[in-house]
Structures are given as structure tokens and as C-alpha cells.
Amino acid sequence: MIFRKISLFFVVFSLVSSFLSADKKQNLLVDTLPKLKTSKAPQSWNDAWNGFDPRAEPIDIEVLKEWEEDNVVLKVLRYRIGIFKGQKAMMAGVYGYPKEGKNLPGLLQIHGGGQYADYKAPLSNAKRGYASISISWAGRISAPGYRVSPLEVKLFWEGKTNDPRYKLTTDWGALDAYHAPSRNGKDAFPSIPVADWTLDSVPSPRNNSWFLATLGARRGLTFLELQPEIDPDKLGVYGHSMGGKLSVLTAGSDKRVKAVVPSCGGISDRYNTNPLHLATVSDPPSLRNIRCPILFQSPSNDFHGRINDLKTSINEIKSKDWRVACSPHHNHQDSAEYEVASQLWFDQYLKGSFKIPSTPQINVNLSKGKKPMVTLNIDESKVDSIDVFYTQQGQMDGKKDDSTNTKSRFWHHVPVLKSNDAWATELSIHSVGKPLWVYANVTYKLGKSITGAGYYYGMYKAEKFTLSSLMQTITPRALKEAKVVATMKPNLVIEDFKDDWKKEWFSYNKSKWGIRTHKIYDPVWAAPQKANLYFEVKAEMPNKMIVGLDSYVTEISLTGNNSWQGVKLRVSDFKNIEMKSKNAWSAFRQLRLNDVEQQRPPKGSRIAPRTLGAPWKGRAPEFRYLRWLIPS
């Protein structure tokens, strides 16, 4: 096969080059990217790649650590990114594959901002029959016996090889594509700087760190296709947050990608005020190049990959094979039934061992004098549940995204019933003067459970998976013109804890009973002036618990004995880490019930962390009558 011949050539080349003198080696370091012929920089994403061949240079693999775990071969290593301004750049990462594996699909995993390349990704992937590399574009690595934190990254920059904590990691050479922190103190992701540590002497997309990190990822694809255990025709890419955007940029610049899954990124970088950024390293130019199957993981309240940009992104891609998975209420995190969709996507398109159901189709009907009516057309194979979520807190004013609102908006839930071979439900709205955003989730049962490493490498076990419809957005003008009715009135009862109440609450740790909601931010449950917050709780044993409002918390002692205990709270009962309180309930957006929570001081503060509540004893508590009480 041609890739095996290339690999053999690289090995021979490396052996020969090892005998060359240092001067001759230096002469071989021809820059990876051609110099600009004029002072004009590339003006498009495609033009930025002119003259770059990701397979042209040796890969120069350096194995820094190797071990076996659960019949999986794992290696911390570095490969050559390229030569820039005469200096070699090297990408560190963690590579893993099942021992004795052959003709395996290969995965490139890209971490997010502030995160690490982590061995748990290739380890869990290998157990499912994949070879994969978790690349460390920012320099941080997490592996047994080889951890590179920001401290070790700084030691590497400073060349302090005598320090016992020193470790080799990603080396950007003459350039700087590091992040959190960057080596030169200036983040070159949102900007296009010109400096002695950038490639071009004029504003150029090749100076931007998105471009450089994407180049490093493309070289990662070359690394994968040269490994003897990998089928080079079956390569996939996935990543979270900044890694989600980099996944889109990589798939949008390299045809070797046969499937891609961005989570919480790759759809909302479309509002930068710099025209050169928009034309090159923003999301749309890459999205318009994507022809491979793509699955977007986009939680409803994510600040980085916003759900209202998802439909636009779908319209931009060239691929007809796409799905979306949108968890309600979540921001930049997910639970197992949403995270597992990435594994199923690769199983279908790289292994041919799974078939993903079709995308749920949603339609919102507006009729005079009636509530908005939702109808669905779904793939009914192995359906576990069907849910519709909607909000009237979506932003459609054309202004800059209100990040606080995006992360906090409340999504109402309604169950869906089948009548006359059609799935349908009505929506109770509180105003025709506010926009209406609606989407549906269909959850399917898995034949057997799947275990994997999540967005932040926490291990999850999924018994089911969820696919979403595209969100439908309806303007206030459309609601008024249709003369639909707004039937939802202000309500003092926040939660009755009956039926499907948990659908309007959420948790990122389902192994514990703690739960949270944004209901108090919705106008329907706005607190009257001078109201108290009241609920009743039943605990099996004496315990402590917390009630949290954003970063403000109060502690409650419970008597236990399986008897109902009333709790009445004033807004002044909730304190932040500085022991300060707010004057009004309207200042808060999220309500939490949990057993224990630690308040952390701001960075640089001398205030000690404060723990409230205590680890729970006995069965999970029961709740009822969560409401606002108006003093008589």
C-alpha cells in the first residue's frame, strides 16, 4: 500500500539523516510553508493552505514513554509538525491501540481550552477497536507517570532540563500556538497579530493560532495513516470546545477525514469584527468545505457552540450525512446519552457496525385562537422516549450574544403523544411578544451498554442515546400574525416534583441526587417582591444539605426520621464566598439542591474555600411544594 511505502521511506530517511553533520541537518530544514510572494496575505481559508502538503515531510516520531494497560499499547510521543522560520515544531500526544490490532480505524482527538491530551481517550477507544491519538496542541499532557501541567510547560519553555519536573512536550519552535497560557502573553486565537513569533510580517491567517493548531492536527492525520495497525482510509476527528472548532477546521481542510464529531464548538465563530478572520479562520469557511459525515453535539445552553447557530451551520456544510444531539439545560457539558453519540457515529462510518436513526423532523403549526402545535416525524426503531423542549428566552435582537442569558435560559418540557399515527403536543406560552424556540429529542435504547471517556475524560456508561431535531425559531411577529394564544400565567409553584418533573431540571453527575434548574429565571416563576422560598424535604437520616442560587449558598440541617420538614428561606439567607448577600431574587438564574458544595474564592483572593452541607447518609431525599411564599 502506498502509505506503507511512504512509512518505509521515512524510516530510511531518518536513519540516513542521523549520520549527517549538524550543519547539513540544518540545511535540510526547509520551511513547511512557502513565504509570501508579496506583502498580501491569503484572503481565504483555502488560499491559506497553498503550498502545504501534510504528507511531504518526515514525521520524526519520538517515543517519550510506552506502557501496556488492559491489553492496550499506549505511548506518550511527539511527531513533527513542520519547520517554521528555520526551527522544527513538534506535537506531543498520547497514542494508543489494541495490542495485536490490525486494519483499525484511526481517531484524532483534540482537547479544548485549558484542557489536556489525556491517555483515557485512546485507552477507552482502543477497547472498542480503534487506534487513536490525543494531541496536545496547548502542551499539557495527562498520562500515568507523564503529566505536563502549566508548570511543566513553563519549565519546558525556559529549558530548565535540570529541574526534576521537566518534561518534553509540544514545541511550537519559532511560533506560539499555545493557550492558557500562551508563551508570549498574547492569545493569537481571536486575533491575527504580527510579531517576531508569528510566521508572516503582515496580518495573515497563517499568524493565527487556529490555523497553526489545525496544521498540527492535519499532521496528526499523517501520523495516524503511517501507523502499521491503522487502515489509512478510515480516519475520524473529534474534539470538545476549542477542540470542537479545531475538528471543524481540520475536516474543512483535509479530505482524509471520513467522519467528524465537534462538541460545543465549530458553529458560532461567525461574529468576529475582523473581515480577515471571518474570511479565513472563522467557522463558515471550513463548514462550507465539509463533505464527510458530521455529528454536532450542541447542548441547548452552551456559550461556545450556540444552538441558534446550528441550523445555519447545517445549511453551510456540503455533507448530506449529519445529525445533531442537543441536551436540554446543559452548558459546555453533557451526560452519557448525549456523549455516546460520537462513538456510534464513528462505529457507523468507520467500522460499519452501527446504524444511526434518521434525524427527527419537527414542525410548529400556528393557528388562530389556539396554542402552538408541534408535530413530529421520527424513526421509531427502539424508541425509549420522545420529548419536546421550548423556551421564550432566546435572543433574536441581532445584538451581540448575551452569554449570561444563553447559559441560563429555561427550557420548558412537554411530553409527546401519538394520535392517528402522528406524534404531537401543544405548547403553553406566556407571551406572543417573545420569540419561541422549539426542538425535539428522541432517545433510543442501545442493545448493550457502551463505556467511553467524555468531553473532560470522565468515564461514562451509556444504556441509551439521544438524537435531536433542528431547532425551529418563531419570531414574535409570526406569533402575533397567527393570533395564537398565550395561556401560561405567572405561577407561585416552582415545582411539584410529580411525573416528568426531572425533565426541567438537570445534573452533570447522575451518580448523586443533586439537581438544578433555571426555572427561577423564567418570567413564569419570577419571585414576587418580599417573597420567601419554601419547600418541604423528607430524609431518612439526620443530614445537612445546601440550597444554591448561582454562586450564593445556604446550608440546612435536616432531622431525618422519614418525616416531612418545611424549609423557608429569605433572599438574605444566601451568601457568597465573601459572606455577602443579594437584595432581590431577580438577581439569580439557577437554583440547586444538593448534599454538599464548596465555595471557591476568586483567583488571587486570600479568602479560604468554604464547604457547606455534608456527604449524604441514607436514601436520597424526597421533595415537595417548592414555591414562593408571600408574607401575609
What residue spans do the PLM features occupy?
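N-terminal cap/lid segment of alpha/beta-hydrolase-fold proteins
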Residues: 51-101
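Short beta-strand element of the alpha/beta-hydrolase
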Residues: 92-95, 102-112, 132
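Primarily recognizes the serine-hydrolase "nucleophile elbow" in alpha/beta-hydrolase
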Residues: 115, 219-278
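Cap/lid segment of the alpha/beta-hydrolase catalytic domain
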Residues: 123-126, 131-214, 271-274
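The feature captures the conserved acid-bearing segment of alpha/beta-hydrolase catalytic domains
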Residues: 265, 269-317
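Catalytic histidine neighborhood in serine/cysteine hydrolases
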Residues: 317-334
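Surface beta-strand/loop "capping" patches
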Residues: 347-390, 415-418, 483-487, 529
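Extracellular ligand-binding interfaces
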Residues: 493, 506-587, 592-610, 616-631
